[in-house]
Regions:
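Sequence/structural signature of beta-propeller domains
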Residues: 1-194
Length: 194
């Protein structure tokens, strides 16, 4: 394929310096804006609130919003964002725990309506926290094949045909069965109706 990098866009230093061991887990484009999702909370940020960033290229401007994460009481577990997609005036946010098999508890798609208010201009200051609504619990889909429930649902896409697709990431590690699963959940409006 032909192509060339036209521009590299670093994250603002006051965000990038506080990401820790995780990083970006999703990028979505809607109209004139580019959305990014951090996988976990900033190192010194509010507990249980992950950052969603909106970059507007025409103004070379970043804005930051918070999205509340589900909670876990399981030792060694954490909740994070795996992916985002833009659809019908909202971000679809894929949130998951680190658990697999029969222990898996949180594998969900949430809907976060695009905000009509400005976000925080940096990693500092007041962070507007957006409201999320549950759009689909994915555990029934993962269990429907009567196989092993994968830890990492890592891909979410609304394709040009209007269908919603998911994919797992087996990471190729020793504590996973090596299986990758691909799901066609159907037309996005129907897939997220419940």
């Amino acid at each position: 394929a032909d192509g060339a990098i036209e521009r590299r866009l670093p994250l603002p230093a006051d965000v990038a310096d506080r990401i820790g061991g995780q990083g970006l887990e999703g990028v979505a484009v809607d109209g004139d804006g580019v959305w990014v999702a951090l996988q976990r909370e900033l190192a010194d940020g509010p507990a249980g609130v992950v950052r969603l960033g909106r970059y507007t290229p025409a103004q070379d401007r970043w804005e930051w919003y918070g999205s509340p994460l589900e909670r876990t009481a399981v030792a060694g577990d954490w909740i994070g964002i795996s992916e985002i997609a833009a659809s019908d005036g909202a971000l679809l946010v894929l949130e998951r725990d680190k658990l697999n098999g029969p222990d898996a508890r949180v594998k969900r798609i949430y809907r976060v309506v695009f905000p009509d208010r400005p976000g925080a201009s940096s990693g500092e200051g007041d962070l507007p926290v957006l409201t999320k609504t549950s759009a689909r619990d994915l555990l029934p889909d993962l269990r429907a094949t009567n196989g092993y429930v994968q830890e990492k649902i890592e891909g979410l896409a609304v394709a040009g045909n209007g269908r919603l697709y998911l994919v797992t990431d087996n990471d190729g590690v020793d504590d996973a069965n090596g299986e990758t699963q691909f799901f066609d959940l159907g037309p996005v409006g129907e897939a997220l109706a419940g």
